[in-house]
Structures are given as C-alpha cells and as structure tokens.
C-alpha cells in the first residue's frame, strides 16, 4: 500500500510540474502578449474622446494599440468597480519592456505627451494574488485630448 501511495504521489508531482503556471506568450511587433490576449487597433476620433469598454482576467481579454502624434497631450483614465484592475501603457517605439505608465489603487489617470509619432499598447490587467477560476472584471478606459 505504501508503494502505491508513493507512486501516486510521484505521478501527481510530475504531472503538476509539466503544466505551465502562466499562459504562453507571443511577440507581436516587439510587444509580448499572452495567448489569451487579443490585440485590437484603435484610433482617436476626429473629435471627442476615445472610450474603450471591456472585460479582463489574468492573461485574457483585449489589449489596445493606439497611434499617437508627437506633441499631442493625452489624458488616459481607467475606471472599474474592481480595485484589482490596473492599466499599463507601453510605447512600441521604445525597445525596452518598461511601461511608460502603470496605474495602481488611487492613481488610475495619467497625462502623457510623446516626443515623436509612435504607437502605445494599452493593457488592462486584473491583478489577483492567487488564481481563481472564472473571475474577471469590467473596465472603461477613456483617452482624452488635452489643450
């Protein structure tokens, strides 16, 4: 009986090690996306604000690619009923992986002015300390031109 239990425990251990803990990633134009993420190209309307509504959970949901012009000042805001939804903004024109903005609780708005024409990747993220099945959260991202 002890031998059977040891074999069963060893089998479970091997099976758990072979399953990846996070989603696989793929590179799209120099930006890493999780397999569950869809890249969606968006653009500012001729007048008014750009509003992006969606749902996200760890490694799943839409991420947005926005073309921005040099010298154009934009205010980007995130709203969600969940305190665990944050937003990261990356610049496709910069080779490093650092976000040019990463929101946190109480700081979900930024004002950015690019020095050159570029594209931003806007990624809403649901941050949970432990994975839970089926959990996700709705969000609204608003991009406004500033004077």
Give a label for each model feature.
Residues 16-18, 80:
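Short linear Ser/Thr-Pro motifs
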Residues 46, 105-106, 137:
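Exposed loop/turn and edge beta-strand positions of beta-sandwich/beta-sheet ligand-binding modules
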Residues 55-127:
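Acidic, Ser/Thr/Pro-rich low-complexity intrinsically disordered segments
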Residues 24-42, 64, 120-147:
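C-terminal edge strands of extracellular/lumenal beta-sandwich accessory domains
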Residues 8-16:
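Bacterial N-terminal signal peptides
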């Amino acid at each position: 009986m002890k031998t059977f239990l040891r074999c069963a425990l060893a089998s479970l251990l091997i099976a758990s090690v072979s399953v990846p803990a996070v989603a696989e990633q793929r590179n799209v134009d120099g930006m890493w996306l999780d397999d569950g993420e869809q890249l969606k190209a968006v653009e500012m309307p001729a007048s008014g604000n750009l509003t992006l509504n969606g749902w996200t959970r760890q490694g799943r949901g839409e991420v947005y690619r926005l073309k921005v012009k040099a010298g154009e000042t934009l205010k980007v805001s995130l709203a969600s009923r969940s305190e665990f939804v944050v937003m990261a903004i990356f610049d496709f024109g910069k080779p490093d992986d650092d976000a040019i903005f990463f929101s946190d609780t109480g700081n979900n708005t930024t004002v950015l002015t690019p020095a050159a024409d570029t594209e931003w990747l806007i990624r809403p993220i649901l941050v949970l300390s432990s994975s839970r099945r089926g959990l996700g959260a709705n969000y609204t991202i608003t991009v406004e031109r500033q004077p």
